[in-house]
Amino acid sequence: MNGSNGDSADGHRPASSSAAPARGRAGRVRMTGKQRREQLLDIGRSVFAERGYDGTSVEEIAERAGVSKPVVYEHFGGKEGLYAVVVDREMQLLLDMVTGALTGGHSRELLEQAAFALMDYIDTSTDGFKILVRDSPVAQATGTFASLISDIATQVEDILGLEFKARGFDARLAPMYSQMLVGMVALTGQWWLEVRKPQKAEVAAHLVNLAWHGLEGMERHPKLVGDRQN
């Protein structure tokens, strides 16, 4: 079901029932269906980030929400459905943050905007990023972190294409270079998530430093130094 109903039929026993566990459910607050759905999404997001998909159970999500398991099934059909919605939301949030940051300006400014937006997402939506970078069977159906990075790279591709043309490089190579740049930022973000230093703005500045000055020193027809042609 889509969770449009309230909690009157959510599978709870009356508060006076001796069979109802005291922990988590004693002070349950009544919510509308929409409020309960959002609560379950928030809790599910936190638990999935903490334990991963396989380590998360419907029982724990229900326990933390102070509801019975049937409530989770009513709103999402089960753990897989809840996880899919969480992943979809996080993917859209990250994509919106990056594309929304590209407000125009010089190519370097656009590169800075994209790099900082990704670092900002990692900083402000840490649980979401942890979920996205983990592999799970469900993520394969709803979209993977790799596919999301590819979507972001498509945005960067337009920036590089213009820059390549201005510098006399083959603009057809822009898609490959955009994958390289975005992949570099994403992997650096995963590293920064663990160490949390230096500050995100400084990390973004170093990323842009490497990327931008690397572009400045590019050769039009690069070749390997060694004899590795195949």
Where are these regions (language model features)?
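Amphipathic alpha-helical segments used for helix-helix packing
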Residues: 121-143, 157-161, 187-194
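Helix-turn-helix
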Residues: 39, 43, 47-81, 85
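Hydrophobic alpha-helical connector segments
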Residues: 85, 99-124, 178-181, 204
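Short coil/turn segments at alpha/beta junctions that flank glycine-rich nucleotide-binding fingerprints
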Residues: 50-54, 125, 167
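Generic hydrophobic, amphipathic alpha-helix propensity
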Residues: 36-44, 61, 86-90, 94-98, ...
